Amino acid sequence: MKRKTLTQYLVEQQRSAQALGPEVRLLIEVVARACKAISHAVSKGALGGVLGSLESENVQGEVQKKLDVLSNEILLEANEWGGHLAAMASEEMETIHLIPNRYPKGEYLLLFDPLDGSSNIDVNVSIGTIFSVLRAPHRVAGADVCEQDFLQPGSQQVAAGYAVYGPQTMLVLTIGNGVVGFTLDREMGSWVLTHESMRIPEDTKEFAINMSNMRHWAPPVKRYIDECLAGKTGPLGKDYNMRWIASMVADVHRILTRGGIFMYPWDAREPGKAGKLRLMYEANPMGLIVEQAGGAAIDGTGRILDIQPDKLHQRVSVILGSKNEVERVGRYHAEAHAS
């Protein structure tokens, strides 16, 4: 039987009772085309002269890789002319990117991490692109937006997704009614539906965390990991395996495929920061995807998608994945705060 393409899937969703709007459909297709271009650049590697770092830093104070900058430019150029967007925001830019006046403006906002896990670029480990779609406030329809218009809780996302550039290139997407996965057919140049309903098991025997930071964690996180390491004879009654790729897209993709819990918690080295990962274009889109796949996503004390952001590049502690494991970590935080 012939498989559906991304375009066919989106058209069917547009026709269905959920009524995906035509602007969102076209926007997702444009983002997907940009991800194909990024995938092509990633796959060329040293042959394309795209490996290595630049002398510049992004707004986060991180040294930019050549592919970081190229991926950011690809997404900006692909999305600014279509008439679907009012503005964009990126990990690589300090301020928002307004749609130029020479192009029509739409009613949506696009946020993205153009190349997540870029520290892995030069060592040929899976990396990816994360994106989130919000609706612009009605008061700004047809006019310029400001940073404040982006500061919406993750529960307001219209769509979210990521592309993972690995042995296969995949696009994982939610428009609020489950999670689907598409694989890039390189011969045909099209995204093909290969995963119709991605679900995360409620329980797991795998955790993903950077164990080298253990001495800096808060007690509830230490407690949970200690119990995982205790194995069958410990309070959780089962042996766990640890997995850590240092690429959020790759780690979350594994969890979507076979279950697990991903943790990038607050640590004591920077006590004034709530966490390391960015809320608006990392935690929120991944949180929506995980929840739509039957999992959970919290910052330790509450649901990530309920957080009201106060700045564009806000950071947050992230604990997401298999529902029962995430809820256990949440209980440990609640017990610690109550004592």
Swiss-Prot record:
Ranges that cross the membrane: none
One Gene Ontology term, aspect cellular component: cytosol
Enzyme Commission number(s) from the entry: 3.1.3.11
Cofactor note: Binds 2 magnesium ions per subunit.
Catalytic activity: beta-D-fructose 1,6-bisphosphate + H2O = beta-D-fructose 6-phosphate + phosphate
Keyword Transmembrane helix belongs to the record: no
One Gene Ontology term of the molecular function aspect: fructose 1,6-bisphosphate 1-phosphatase activity
Record-listed Mg(2+) 2 binding positions: 113, 116, 282
One of the GO BP terms on file: fructose 6-phosphate metabolic process
Binding site for substrate: 116-119, 210, 276
Stored Pfam families: FBPase, FBPase_C
Subunit structure: Homotetramer.
UniProt family annotation: Belongs to the FBPase class 1 family.
Protein name: Fructose-1,6-bisphosphatase class 1
The species this protein was found in: Bordetella pertussis (strain Tohama I / ATCC BAA-589 / NCTC 13251)
